[in-house]
Amino acid sequence: ERGRTEIDIPSVYTRDGRTGNRPTENRLTENTPTGNERTNSPTGNERTGNGRRSYLPAIEVEFEPELTGYYWKRSGMLNIQTKRGCPYECIYCSYPHIDGQCVRTMDPEIIAENILRAKRDYGINYLFFTDSVFNIRPEYNVRLAETLIRRGTNVAWGAYFSPRGIDAEQMRLFRASGLTHIEFGTESFCDRTLEAYGKRFTFGDVVRASRLALDNGVYYAHFLILGGYGDTREHVRETIENSRRLEYTVMFPYAGMRIYPHTRLAELAAREGVVAPDDDLLAPAYYIAPDFDLEEARS
């Protein structure tokens, strides 16, 4: 039976990460506005050092020495953020709630310095920028790419991109700075479904962005959500048909949408009776459109 999930967690501390190295207890006793800092005691009493009044204008970044070698040795890649926050309103996504909708960027010089240090100390040659969407704040992205080139990082990188908000000049610059592959959070190749999902681009944007990647020798993939809110059999057929217009790509299709708290999808799912309004959603719950047929999509 779904509902409230009982878990035993003695305390919770949340804040805008990478705000420095002062101990947690100092941040709670000093009233410095570094973001959302909160503890919940076992008795249920909440102690707030700083309510989230605003977000940091910039985020610090540094590879943790004790973890860098471990992850590089076992995975062959490292991850790093260049910005935090997402201004988009995709109905299923929890990033705007977790990271905020205010975009905060990291100093390109510090990013380059960390990459060079990791390359020198561990021999890394590939990393992934884990921004929710890389190609927002285009002026910043240009500055970052130019910094990577100027500092001679010479490390291949990939990132999550939106199909909208990238032009030929930027793609060439990113490629010169080390971009080797893109993962597009496309979700559908049908404009009607894209609108239902809260996307701000069209299939025409998808075709153009894919062509830009192909023309610049950048590998690219598209993630797809079939049977999400507003999707139908007809829309799925259109997505499958349109997929044939994209060349030399990889597609990752998923069936249904995971319902996360504080999203538009959670509100819609509760309204339709898919989940209860007070469901904490810690146990996974999924929305699958009534008109979606998984077996038909597979065939």
Task: Indicate where each model-derived feature is located.
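Long, intrinsically disordered low-complexity tandem-repeat segments
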Residues: 19-48
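Short, electropositive alpha-helical surface patch
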Residues: 142-148, 232-249
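Acidic/polar loop patches that form or flank catalytic/metal-binding clefts of enzymes
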Residues: 6, 156, 221, 250-255
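Glycine-rich beta-alpha loop elements in corrinoid/cobalamin-binding modules
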Residues: 1-18, 49-50, 254-258, 262
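Flexible glycine/acidic-rich beta-alpha junction loops that bind and position SAM and/or redox cofactors
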Residues: 88, 139, 192, 196-197, ...
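Short, intrinsically disordered, charge-balanced linker/junction segments flanking boundaries
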Residues: 5-9, 14-15, 175, 216, ...
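Radical SAM [4Fe-4S] cluster-binding motif and immediate context
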Residues: 57, 61-221, 226, 241
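Structural recognition of alpha->loop->beta junctions
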Residues: 1, 176-182, 238-254
